[in-house]
Design a protein with these regions (language model features):
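Glycine/Thr-rich phosphate-binding loops that ligate phosphate moieties of nucleotide
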Residues: 1-195
Length: 195
């Protein structure tokens, strides 16, 4: 479905902060949002913009690493999202780095943690050699240069929308409106209770 929509989702932008921002770059009060919706927007646009929005947020983190002096030749991907070829390509195109999908993507975090623990307690002397023996790439994605300009502009739009909406998120945090409690029951403001 998402592959039927061009890069940039025809200007539909998704901010994926459904749980606030959990990295140190933004606000824990941030919320998710779709921007750029029109009568021409369909489910395919929403699906692709959701994938792209997650990648814009991740790109923001990668850019912070780069600005601090870290550099990447390629990135390794794991988890459930790696089972989507279109999402892997979108990630690669937005990050502008090759993406290596690991063979055992579901367990690669455990393998990595075990290798680090082994190194930490002195069981592993040559981490590079042990990693080569235990971590295998299933497939590699390379950036598509035809979408580079579109994604660069959409990354700017993402940052502008994110920054512009921060005061709105702060306002909503303190607004007297319907909220959901931690136990998943609804609470309402006094305005709703009196009606």
């Amino acid at each position: 479905m998402a592959s039927s929509v061009p890069a940039g989702s025809d200007g539909v932008l998704f901010l994926p902060q459904l749980l606030g921002e959990r990295e140190n770059l933004g606000s824990p009060d941030a919320k998710g949002a779709f921007i750029g919706l029109s009568f021409d927007t369909d489910l395919a646009h929403l699906c692709r913009s959701l994938m792209e929005g997650v990648c814009y947020a991740e790109r923001r983190i990668l850019d912070a690493f780069t600005q601090s002096g870290m550099h990447f030749n390629a990135l390794y991907s794991r988890g459930g999202g790696v089972n989507s070829r279109i999402w892997n390509q979108i990630r690669c195109d937005i990050y502008q780095h090759p993406i290596h999908v690991l063979e055992d993507a579901d367990n690669s975090g455990l393998i990595g943690a075990a290798l680090l623990a082994g190194k930490g307690v002195g069981l592993i002397q040559n981490m590079e050699q042990v990693a080569k023996e235990n971590i295998h790439v299933r497939e590699t994605y390379y950036p598509n240069t035809s979408s580079q300009a579109t994604y660069a502009e959409m990354q700017k739009a993402y940052m502008a929308a994110h920054n512009a909406l921060l005061p709105t998120f702060e306002f909503l945090k303190h607004a007297n409106i319907v909220t959901r409690n931690e136990d998943a029951s609804f609470s309402t403001s006094s305005t709703f209770e009196n009606n």
